[in-house]
Amino acid sequence: MVHPRFVFFAFLALSVLLAVMNEDSILSSNKGDSLCCNDHPEFGICTNKSCNKWCLQGCTRGGFCKRKICHCYC
């Protein structure tokens, strides 16, 4: 029979692993590299149509021009 302590630690390790792998997690390693919820001055000249299309490559809600800078929705 499997020891209950082993099951608890396996469950805990799996939970931590899934928390780190989830893109929306606060523990995510690629939070700064995310398109969503960020301004992107590297995009260049901003038009709402082109900014929205560019943001849809990594965000489900698209984006808009915020003070002449492309901003992707959260």
Swiss-Prot record:
It comes from the Eukaryota. Keywords: Antimicrobial, Disulfide bond, Fungicide, Plant defense, Secreted, Signal. One of its GO terms (biological process) is defense response to fungus. One of its GO terms (cellular component) is extracellular region. Residues 1-19 form the signal peptide. Coiled coil: none annotated. Its main location: secreted. Disulfide bonds join C36-C74, C46-C65, C51-C70, C55-C72. InterPro entries: Defensin-like_20-28. It is found in: Secreted. Belongs to the DEFL family. This is Putative defensin-like protein 27. The lineage of its organism: Eukaryota, Viridiplantae, Streptophyta, Embryophyta, Tracheophyta.
